[in-house]
Structure formats: C-alpha cells, structure tokens
Amino acid sequence: MHSTNLLLEEPIRMASILEPSKPSFFPAMTKIVGTLGPKSRAVDTISSCLKAGMSVARFDFSWGDAEYHQETLENLKLAIKSTKKLCAVMLDTVGPELQVVNKSEAAISLEANGTVVLTPDQGQEASSELLPINFSGLAKALKPGATIFVGQYLFTGSETTSVWLEVSEVKGDDVVCVIKNSATLAGSLFTLHCSQIHIDLPTLSDEDKEVIRRWGAPNKIDFLSLSYTRHAEDVRQAREFLSKLGDLSQTQIFAKIENVEGLNHFDEILQEADGIILSRGNLGIDLPPEKVFLFQKSALHKCNMAGKPAVVTRVVDSMTDNLRPTRAEATDVANAVLDGSDAILLGAETLRGLYPVETISIVGKICAEAEKVFNQDLYFKRTVKYVGEPMTHLESIASSAVRAAIKVKASVIICFTSSGRAARLIAKYRPTMPVLSVVIPRLKTNQLRWSFTGAFEARQSLIVRGLFPMLADPRHPAESTSATNESVLKVALDHGKASGVIKSHDRVVVCQKVGDSSVVKIIELDD
C-alpha cells in the first residue's frame, strides 16, 4: 500500500496551536453533507446549517414518506434563497436493507443471554421473544455462530437502542439467536445487519425506483446515493434507469460501500460510479475493528488518484446528544481529511441530533485545521507520478494551473468550465487555495423550447474538496472571444473580492478556453 503520511514535514511551534484561527469566507475546503430530518428541517435551522458550512443536503428515504421529504425540500429552497448559498440535493436509497418490522411500535425489551427468534412471517406481532423481518431468505443465508446487529436506523453504536445477536440454530425459515447485550428497541422499523452474507435482493428496489420517479425526477436531484452497492453492474443499472427520467440523466451516482461484497469489487465500482461513499457504520460491522482504518486509507487513495470525490460517514456520533465530540472523534475527522476525503457526511448527528448547526460548525473547523497541515507538495508529486506520461491535454493543463498557483502563491484559482470536468481535475491535485469554478451555461433545445445547462454542473461541484461554484451569465458562450471572457472574469474576480478570498495585489491563476486553446494565465490585481 502507498504511504499516506501527508502531514507537513516541518514541525510547528507548540504555542501556535493555541492561536485562534483566522476567520474565512469558506469555512473549509472539505465539504459537509448534512442529513435533513426532524431536528434540522425548519427554515431557520437549515439556513444556519448552510451558513455553518453544509453544501449538500441528504434526504434519507429509509424513513419518512415523500410528502414529508418534500416539505423539508421546500424549506431548503427558502433557506437557499434567504442565505444566497448554493446547496445540492442527495437522495439516499434504501437498497437491499433488512429490517425488523414492529407494527405496534411498542418498545421491545431484550435481555442479555436470553433468546429471540427472527421470523419472515410479518403477520406476527413483534415482541421480546419474536422479531418479524422483511426477508424470507435469511435462514438459508445464516449458519450457527453468525453475528447479527439490530438497531435504530442511523444508530450511533453507543446507544442502548441497538443489540448484538448470535445465531444459535436455524429452524426452517426461522433463526434462533442468543442476545449478547440488553437493549430496548423503540419505533416501527429497525435496521438488521448480518456480517459477511449475500442478500439476494436488488440493489435498486421497486420502492426505490418509485421514489426516484415520483420525488427525485420532479426535484431534479443532483446526487443519487446508491445504498449497498455490491458490483459495478449495480451502478450501470441505476444509470440506465436514471437516463430514462429526463433531467436525471445528469444526476451523479455515488456508490455506497457498506459490506464486504462492495469492498471486494471496489475497483470496478469506482470505475463506474461518479463518486464513493464509505459507509463506515455498516462496513464497520462486517470488518474486524483493526481493519477499518486500512480500508479507509486504501479506498480514499484510490478515489483521489481516480479524481473522483470520496465521502466519509460516521465521524461524530456522540454529537447526536452532546455539544462537543470526543477526542477520538475530533482526531478521526482530521485524519479523514489527511487521508484524502472530499466530504464528511453527517447522519444521525443532524437528522435527529440535538445540535445539528453546532455539529456542522465544529466538523468544519476541524477540517479547516487539518487542511493547514496537509502536505500538498508530497501529494502533488505522488499524483503526477501515478497519472504518468503522456498526460491527457486537460490533465496537463489542470496540474500546471495548480503548480503555477502554488509557485506564485496565488490566493485563488479561477476555472472557466461548461461540463465541470476541468475544475474537478484541478481539484484532484488538491491546491492549497480555493478553486472558483465559473460554470458557463450551454444553450440547448428540444425543438420546442430553449433551455440552459449549467445548474447541475455547478451544484455537483459542491461535494468536491476545494471547489466553489458560481454560474456565469448565460449570454456568454463557453468558447467566447477574449473580450467576453474578460468580462466574465471580472464578475468572478468581483465575487472573489466580495467574499474576501481575493484582495488588492493578490495573484490569481486563471484557467480558461480561448477558441480551441486551453490557457493558464497569472494575473496580479491592482488597487
């Protein structure tokens, strides 16, 4: 495995650790995905989340109906309008998730060393002795000694609302288990996770397809989080489905790696997907604890070299109920950044946590501090070596823009792009300064009406480390004259000045297309 020692080599003064950080318009280069739910769906709360640094809003359809999520989305739109901050939308599918069904919703108490039976007969009432499940093939997949985890959805792992079971025997379609710890299951649905077994259910279920068709398509979702991705074929099938739903042909698919099957096929999945979500909660059940860090470092390195965004989950579980993360969690967030994560995904912490805004703010601050000690020089050299020669034309321009920006100590890189690809390639080389991605819309027609592309591309950069999008005036085409491009550049520079990232006498690196040529130029601002 490649060495991932990406800390700065020169030691820092210990006293400097105590110095307060300088305020910045961009809280961190690393992006934050927030899951919206009961504790974070009010307009004021969402507005505060956006100001604190959330750039992607995740809608988890493992719970809540389409009507509930639509209300939340409408609130998000109002918050975006009031804060003037862009935010992308991610739809998270349920996938082949096993669930315990508790129709009565009465609390179920389970005592350690007792026994409980898992049955596919959903007509039965859930009790301390019997738990109905939504899958009839569990008995065929399990053997005595197998471990099963049952818990509240978006559990934190430290709660008494989750239980570990060990299979003692299989009786027909039923599975008899020994309870390993005392717990109380409250609610109507609980996630059931079995370690290292194949579940013969489709990755994109009929229910998922219906949600995407009825909710995702009208709302033009930016990202589809494909839960329990196990093979590249899962991504291909999802993409084929999206391609038939109009604008969703532009939706990016993020493969969620949640089990050993996905881990074993990681390389082929990465090749097919637009990005990867490392679902450490479920995967952490499948893997021995001492192997989790190894998977994280390897997976993030592969994503970085492929130039595809990687998202890490389950970082500050304790902030679901507490105002401050544990020391281990704070270190974990920083290490995720140093390992190469593009974004941090918050689940229970913002969905039902008591402090959604504070959580986003604290995670953003930790990310920003970690970014200061990231060894960009070592990372750049490693990435160039990995890509090899000859580079593609676009990759050569992107890497040159980053190297030039670092050499002249530019305050920002401005990249004109229509597809977003050039800006993402620049971000791949992890520049130490923000990349302002100026998305130039393209005009298209279906013979009945005109429309512009660009909004998807702008929002989809909100999950990429260091990329900050703005939409250019649609009257300026992508391959415009030098004079027109200069006017778009002036708008971009004014935006940078207004946001505080560009000041007088700063140097700025500009990456643009003039005619058929790609140009990297360095400009110095006067007063």
From Swiss-Prot:
<dbReference type="Pfam" id="PF02887">
    <property type="entry name" value="PK_C"/>
</dbReference>
<feature type="binding site">
    <location>
        <position position="60"/>
    </location>
    <ligand>
        <name>K(+)</name>
    </ligand>
</feature>
<dbReference type="InterPro" id="IPR015806">
    <property type="entry name" value="Pyrv_Knase_insert_dom_sf"/>
</dbReference>
<comment type="subunit">
    <text>Homotetramer.</text>
</comment>
<dbReference type="GO" id="GO:0006096">
    <property type="term" value="P:glycolytic process"/>
</dbReference>
<dbReference type="GO" id="GO:0016301">
    <property type="term" value="F:kinase activity"/>
</dbReference>
<keyword id="KW-0460">Magnesium</keyword>
<dbReference type="GO" id="GO:0005829">
    <property type="term" value="C:cytosol"/>
</dbReference>
<feature type="binding site">
    <location>
        <position position="62"/>
    </location>
    <ligand>
        <name>K(+)</name>
    </ligand>
</feature>
<keyword id="KW-0670">Pyruvate</keyword>
<dbReference type="InterPro" id="IPR015813">
    <property type="entry name" value="Pyrv/PenolPyrv_kinase-like_dom"/>
</dbReference>
<comment type="function">
    <text>Key regulatory enzyme of the glycolytic pathway that catalyzes the final step of glycolysis, converting ADP and phosphoenolpyruvate (PEP) to ATP and pyruvate by essentially irreversible transphosphorylation. Is critical for plant growth and development.</text>
</comment>
<dbReference type="InterPro" id="IPR011037">
    <property type="entry name" value="Pyrv_Knase-like_insert_dom_sf"/>
</dbReference>
<dbReference type="GO" id="GO:0005737">
    <property type="term" value="C:cytoplasm"/>
</dbReference>
<feature type="binding site">
    <location>
        <position position="282"/>
    </location>
    <ligand>
        <name>substrate</name>
    </ligand>
</feature>
<feature type="binding site">
    <location>
        <position position="282"/>
    </location>
    <ligand>
        <name>Mg(2+)</name>
    </ligand>
</feature>
<dbReference type="GO" id="GO:0000287">
    <property type="term" value="F:magnesium ion binding"/>
</dbReference>
<feature type="binding site">
    <location>
        <position position="258"/>
    </location>
    <ligand>
        <name>Mg(2+)</name>
    </ligand>
</feature>
<keyword id="KW-0808">Transferase</keyword>
<comment type="similarity">
    <text>Belongs to the pyruvate kinase family.</text>
</comment>
<dbReference type="GO" id="GO:0005524">
    <property type="term" value="F:ATP binding"/>
</dbReference>
<keyword id="KW-0479">Metal-binding</keyword>
<dbReference type="InterPro" id="IPR040442">
    <property type="entry name" value="Pyrv_kinase-like_dom_sf"/>
</dbReference>
<dbReference type="InterPro" id="IPR001697">
    <property type="entry name" value="Pyr_Knase"/>
</dbReference>
<keyword id="KW-0418">Kinase</keyword>
<keyword id="KW-0324">Glycolysis</keyword>
<feature type="binding site">
    <location>
        <position position="256"/>
    </location>
    <ligand>
        <name>substrate</name>
    </ligand>
</feature>
<feature type="binding site">
    <location>
        <position position="93"/>
    </location>
    <ligand>
        <name>K(+)</name>
    </ligand>
</feature>
<dbReference type="InterPro" id="IPR015795">
    <property type="entry name" value="Pyrv_Knase_C"/>
</dbReference>
<keyword id="KW-0630">Potassium</keyword>
<keyword id="KW-0067">ATP-binding</keyword>
<feature type="site" description="Transition state stabilizer">
    <location>
        <position position="256"/>
    </location>
</feature>
<dbReference type="GO" id="GO:0004743">
    <property type="term" value="F:pyruvate kinase activity"/>
</dbReference>
<feature type="binding site">
    <location>
        <begin position="60"/>
        <end position="63"/>
    </location>
    <ligand>
        <name>ATP</name>
    </ligand>
</feature>
<feature type="binding site">
    <location>
        <position position="58"/>
    </location>
    <ligand>
        <name>substrate</name>
    </ligand>
</feature>
<keyword id="KW-0963">Cytoplasm</keyword>
<comment type="pathway">
    <text>Carbohydrate degradation; glycolysis; pyruvate from D-glyceraldehyde 3-phosphate: step 5/5.</text>
</comment>
<dbReference type="GO" id="GO:0030955">
    <property type="term" value="F:potassium ion binding"/>
</dbReference>
<feature type="binding site">
    <location>
        <position position="92"/>
    </location>
    <ligand>
        <name>K(+)</name>
    </ligand>
</feature>
<protein>
    <recommendedName>
        <fullName>Pyruvate kinase 1, cytosolic</fullName>
        <ecNumber>2.7.1.40</ecNumber>
    </recommendedName>
</protein>
<keyword id="KW-0547">Nucleotide-binding</keyword>
<dbReference type="InterPro" id="IPR015793">
    <property type="entry name" value="Pyrv_Knase_brl"/>
</dbReference>
